[in-house]
From Swiss-Prot:
Subcellular location, principal: nucleus
Oligomer status and interactors: Interacts with TCEA2 and ELOA.
Recorded coiled-coil stretches: 83-112
Composition skew (Low complexity), residue ranges: 468-479, 534-550, 573-583
Lineage, top ranks: Eukaryota, Metazoa, Chordata, Craniata, Vertebrata
Name of this chain's protein: RNA exonuclease 1 homolog
Molecular function in Gene Ontology: exonuclease activity; nucleic acid binding
Tree of life domain: Eukaryota
Entry GO terms, CC: nuclear body
Enzyme Commission (EC) number: 3.1.-.-
Length: 1213
């Protein structure tokens, strides 16, 4: 059956009473059974029915635990026996035991309260302590119910719900007990299950922390759970341990996850529950021992496993068997059902459960200290002792011996008094429990709860320990080896929860560390307890958080509780040693004597485990910052540390593990208050030195009065000290900026008079043992060496498969573009963006690598041409700063004038402007012959307004309607209006032909696509077009003479026009005029007289949008130009004849750059303006994909002419 969610537990079962077939016999009944359990009826609430309660208690913590226990008992008696009689029997047994336990725990509670009131440390926690005591007693009471239920054996079946049920039982039992104490009686028990047990159970199982519940509430104590077992003894320690969640109680959180445990008890009753019973006996047995007898202890044991008889037998089993069980518990906590750990736990719990009750009361409020004082000894059950012993054995077999002697001595002195004290409040109860436990062979450890028990009945604990050791040996050297390996592996992680419980888990190792911590934390409380075994338990309890954590690590509960336990690092060993040396000695004496006999002398792997444990312990303590807490530890703790330290000198020698009693005295002598101090490693030394050096330099820099000293702080010295920097003067001066150099020069001048680098001030600033160079490493002087420009992360052009230009070439030019753009761009990002755009344009315009190289070179020249604009300003500014002797002695022009006979190599360049430029340009005017050769228009001698061209070849087609395409050379027919008769696409090459020398001759190719002559054109137009300018020579105008003042000149202008194809050929669409200052004086779009067929945007840059709103006609432009120009005005242009033909203007005073810079092959070849600018002026023009710009071309012509004049002037001189 699936476990019930408990939705119907508040509804009375219709078959429970008055049913014709008798009371409800369904074990899975989801309804409430009233009167199922007398004492638990009021508290059980919805769990009254034994079967249903049993089924639900594990999962529904709210249900009263007494019913759960009954139900568990009923189920435990037989897996298949679910008869109502069994349930009734369980109920009766529970009732009787509950009453007995209530009485006994009331007495124990009073005693515990009195004892808790005694210790000063417990006083502040008295309220909590009393409550915790109730919880502790309730735990013991819980155990007693377990014992009562154990005969029923019905509890064993309950293991299905064991994780939760035990938790519930504990909760109910503690509730009942605590309430019984308050109210005193079964009624109190009933009340607790209802109010306390269920709420606590619900909250705790939900949180998954039975263990926590046990520590804080008595109800969890009454609950029986393998986890609760530890919580029972743990409750004395519960608060701390629960917080740590080292034990199963926390495991009970895992217990809900531990539902497998419930299943586990069901399938292997004896296996899973036997272990629980063992742990429970250890935990809860002491209360029973006090009240009932070993029998009661056995009953609780049977409760946990569900096999009462087997548990009693186990209790009475040989010490060897119990030792084996304890070893199993310690080393294999995961095996919940293993009985071997039962003896250990039983012996431990018997003495400690009453004390645990008191301790639990204390722990919730004060934590470890309260636990230690009030019920630490009691709370440390024999199982805890055994676990501690085992842990200590593992830690250092030699140390246990020494400790035993020392502890025995201590016990003799202070133990008698503290024992009396501890026994006073708790001793009475603890002693009966210890006696009872001693009576039972398995519970001989119970003597430990009583102060005399550990010492006088030390053989009892020793015997169990010996049994443990013997059983451990029996268990298999393999297991020990596994434990060692696990302890080694787990020793690295200091978290007990992570460790496995079978091996000396790191949790156990860590538990030892926790002991040390707890000892430091609760040293005061242990002082009250130390003489008594309870003080040992108090040590464990102070450690109980850790020691129980260790024990729990060994025990199934600790498996579950282990993860929570890790938060509470203190280990039982360390805390016990620190809390009470005497009690620790008692524990160590008992445990280590047995271990020494059986383990230490034999070549047992445990020795290595102990050595490793000790080593890891020291490391853990250091890592966890326990050093600060350890100094106040008691002498006993010091001895314990001494025993630990003895291993360090001879870590690799086994002899160190076999420390003999005589060595113990030596150990205390060299025992450091803190874990043995080890010399720092080389890395630590270097790190510390570096930190100190940095602090030293930082403080000195702050104290430095002037920034100049900071700049020269390379020499790290006192602020006012003068330093000599002979060792690093040049690099710093060379790399430092100008301001820094001045500061350095000043500081160096001071340093020249200062002491040597090894002067005393410098030594005082350096750490002892550190080279003086350390000071220089701290100085940030290398900053001066860093370049002024930050390293720029340049973009990378992605590789393109099959690209027309190699990526490497593109990347090289992109880097060059970025460098040039950085010179005039305001930011790096702007420069990168501009360079990327320029490179992208060049790549898009280049169909081949050769063309890309040309375009890239031109682009680079253009970018370089933009830089000089800013350079002159910088040079002037820098020149102003220079003050030389010549300027001072000779005046303003002294630095620029030479008084020597030798003339300067470079002549002084005159400014070319105005009349000077005009006069110089007259030398470059085209002659009449040149005008005719280049096709300039002349006035027609016969027709006014007509023009004549002397180079025009008259090609008169036979058919007047036939035209020849000027782009592809195809003949096509036109109508009278000039339109094509037939629509036909035009395939042409827009580039010029270029001849290249190849092997065996010359090769002519088109520049646009590098195709051979005669190949199909690379561009496509909608129709054919014609030039038509030379055929339409009408409408020309001629410039005329104008009178000018004597000082004036006719003017110099650069002219450029853009044309588009119309139905009658090329016509003017834009005109631009630029003066000598490169300023545009006239620029306008012109509307053609005929319909535009092709705007020729590639070359003209004119688009349809530009001419939409244009109303200026050619006649308007002619009028403007005639008003601006005269017959003597010099016009500059490239192939200016084409522009004059488009303007239909006749002008003979021109300077043509195509003639000024002729082609090497002569006419008709001409060099392009773009190439001229790139070759002579290192500037790139016409690189805009949108087409040429007439203003750019005009300005380029003006630059070329002026440059030509200056160059010629140099040669003529």
């Amino acid at each position: 059956m699936l476990r019930s969610t408990g939705f119907f537990r508040s509804i009375d079962c219709p078959y429970w009473a008055g049913a014709p077939g008798g009371p409800c016999r369904r074990p899975y009944c989801h309804f409430r059974h009233r009167g199922a359990r007398g004492p638990g009826a009021p508290g059980s609430g919805g769990a009254a029915s034994p079967a249903s309660g049993l089924g639900y208690d594990p999962y529904n913590p709210e249900l009263p635990q007494p019913p759960v226990q009954r139900e568990n008992g009923a189920l435990g008696q037989g897996d298949g026996m679910l008869e109502l009689e069994l349930v009734n029997q369980a109920i009766e047994a529970v009732r009787g035991e509950v009453e007995l336990e209530q009485r006994r725990y009331q007495e124990l509670l009073e005693t515990a309260r009195g004892h808790s009131a005694g210790p000063s440390a417990l006083a502040p926690c008295s309220p909590a302590t009393s409550i915790d005591d109730d919880d502790t007693f309730s735990l013991a009471l819980t155990y007693t119910p377990g014992g009562l239920l154990s005969p029923d054996a019905a509890y064993q079946p309950t293991p299905l719900a064991v994780p939760a049920e035990p938790g519930h039982k504990y909760s109910l039992a503690p509730s009942d007990r605590s309430q019984g104490r308050a109210a005193g009686g079964a009624g109190a028990l009933e009340y607790v299950p209802k109010a306390v047990g269920q709420p606590r159970r619900c909250g705790r199982p939900v949180s998954g922390g039975k263990y926590v519940v046990d520590s804080s509430k008595p109800s969890t104590d009454l609950e029986y759970d393998p986890l609760s077992n530890y919580s029972a003894r743990h409750l004395g320690r519960a608060s701390a341990r629960d917080e740590r969640a080292t034990k199963r109680p926390r495991g009970s959180r895992g217990a809900e996850p531990y539902t497998p445990a419930l299943k586990k008890p069901c399938d292997p009753f004896g296996g899973c529950e036997a272990r629980f019973s063992d742990s429970e006996d250890d935990v809860t047995s002491p209360p029973k021992a006090d009240v009932s007898s070993p029998k009661a202890g056995a009953d609780p044991e049977s409760k946990a496993p569900g096999k009462p008889v087997s548990k009693e037998g186990r209790e009475h089993e040989d010490g060897g068997l119990r030792g084996t069980k304890e070893m199993a518990v310690q080393y294999d906590v995961e095996d919940l059902g293993q009985p071997p750990k039962a003896p250990d736990t039983v012996s431990v719990v018997k003495p400690g459960s009453p004390a645990r009750a008191s301790q639990d009361a204390r722990v919730p409020k004060e934590g470890k200290a309260k636990k230690k004082k009030s019920g630490t000894s009691a709370s440390l059950s024999h199982k805890d002792k055994v676990r501690k012993k085992d842990k200590k054995k593992e830690k250092d077999p030699a140390r246990p011996r020494g400790k035993e002697k020392v502890c025995t001595d201590k016990k003799k002195l202070p133990a008698s008094n503290p024992r009396g004290k501890a026994q006073g409040p708790e001793g009475t109860k603890k002693k009966p429990s210890s006696a009872t436990t001693v009576a039972s062979s398995g519970k001989g450890g119970s003597g430990r709860p009583s102060s005399t028990g550990p010492q006088d009945s030390g053989p009892g604990p020793h015997a169990p320990l010996a049994w443990k050791a013997g059983s451990a040996k029996k268990m298999s050297s393999g297991k020990l080896v596994e434990r060692k390996a696990r302890s080694l592996d787990e020793g690295a992680p200091q978290d007990t929860p992570k460790l496995k419980k079978r091996a000396l888990s790191h949790a156990e190792l860590f538990g030892d560390e926790s002991e040390e911590e707890d000892s430091s934390l609760g040293a005061g409380a242990p002082r009250v307890w130390p003489p008594t075994l309870p003080s040992l338990s108090s040590d464990s309890e102070s450690d109980s958080d850790s020691s129980l954590g260790l024990d729990e690590t060994k025990v199934p509960k600790r498996l579950k509780a282990a993860p929570p336990a890790s938060p509470v690092p203190p280990s039982p060993l360390s805390s016990s040693s620190s809390s009470s040396g005497a009690s620790q000695c008692a524990e160590e004496d008992v445990d280590y004597s047995a271990l020494e006999k059986e383990v230490d002398f034999d070549v047992d792997p445990m020795e290595e485990c102990l050595r490793i444990f000790n080593e890891s312990t020291s490391v853990k303590t250091e890592d966890k910052g326990r050093l600060a807490r350890q100094p106040p530890k008691e002498k006993a703790e010091e001895k314990t540390h001494a025993g630990l330290t003895t291993l360090f000198p001879g870590q690799k020698r086994r002899v160190s593990h076999l420390c003999k009693p005589g060595k113990e005295s030596e150990a205390p002598k060299r025992t450091p208050v803190a874990p043995p101090a080890r010399p720092p490693t080389a890395q630590e030394v270097c790190y510390r030195r570096a930190q100190l050096a940095q602090r030293d330099s930082a403080s000195w820099l702050q104290a430095a009065p002037r920034p100049t000293e900071r700049l020269s702080s390379v020499h790290i010295s006192a602020p006012g000290e003068k330093r000599r920097i002979a060792h690093v003067p040049n690099p710093r001066l060379a790399a430092a900026p100008t301001g820094a150099k001045r500061a350095l020069s000043a500081s160096s001048s001071q340093a020249s008079h200062g002491p040597e680098p090894g002067s005393q001030p410098l030594k005082t600033r350096t750490l002892s043992g550190m080279a003086s160079k350390t000071t220089t490493t701290v100085t940030p002087k290398r900053i001066a060496h860093s370049p002024s420009l930050q390293s720029l992360k340049k973009p990378v052009i992605p590789k393109e498969f099959g690209g027309k230009v190699p990526t490497v070439v593109r990347q090289r030019y992109l880097n060059l573009f970025i460098e040039e753009c950085l010179k005039f761009c305001s930011s790096n990002q702007e420069a990168i963006e501009k360079a990327l755009n320029e490179e992208k344009v060049a790549y898009d315009r280049s169909p081949s690598k050769n063309i890309y190289l040309n375009v890239a070179v031109n682009t680079l020249k253009k970018l370089r041409g933009l830089v000089p604009n800013t350079v002159p300003n910088l040079s002037k500014a820098s020149g102003r700063r220079v003050v030389s002797h010549e300027v001072v002695l000779g005046g303003k022009l002294a630095a620029k004038t030479s008084f020597s006979l030798s003339r300067p190599s470079s002549p002084r360049v005159e400014e070319l402007k105005g009349t000077a430029l005009y006069s110089r340009l007259r030398e470059y005017l085209l002659t009449q012959e040149q005008l005719k050769e280049n096709g300039y228009p002349f006035p027609h001698p016969e027709r006014p307004g007509g023009a004549i061209i002397f180079t025009a070849e008259e090609k008169k087609p036979k058919d007047p309607s036939c035209r020849i395409c000027c782009r592809c050379g195809t003949e096509y027919l036109v109508s009278s209006s000039g339109r094509c008769v037939r629509s036909e696409e035009c395939y042409y090459h827009w580039g010029r032909l270029r001849r290249n020398r190849v092997a065996g001759g010359w090769e002519t190719q088109y520049m646009c696509c590098s195709a051979a002559v005669g190949s199909v054109g690379c561009q496509v137009a909608k129709q054919h077009v014609q030039d038509g300018r030379k055929e339409n020579l009408e409408g020309f105008v001629r410039t005329f003479q104008k009178e000018l003042p004597e000082d004036a000149h006719a003017g110099v202008f650069a002219l450029d026009c853009e044309m588009s194809y119309t139905t009658y050929g090329l016509e003017l669409t834009r005109v631009t005029v630029v003066d000598t200052d490169m300023q545009v004086v006239y620029d306008t779009f012109v509307k053609p007289d005929n319909e535009v067929v092709d705007y020729n945007t590639r070359f003209s840059g004119v688009t349809e949008a530009d001419l939409v709103d244009t109303s200026i006609t050619l006649r308007d432009v002619q009028a403007v130009l005639l008003s601006m120009f005269s017959a003597d005005t010099i016009l500059i242009g490239h192939s200016l004849e084409s522009d004059l033909l488009a303007l239909k203007v006749i002008h003979g005073t021109v300077v043509d750059t195509s003639v000024l810079f002729p082609h090497r092959l002569g006419l008709p070849y001409k060099r392009s303006l773009r190439n001229l600018m790139a070759d002579y002026l290192r500037q790139i023009i016409q690189d805009n994909v949108d087409g040429h710009s007439s203003s750019e071309d005009a300005s380029a012509c003006m630059h070329l002419v002026i440059w030509k004049i200056r160059e010629d002037a140099k040669t003529k001189r």
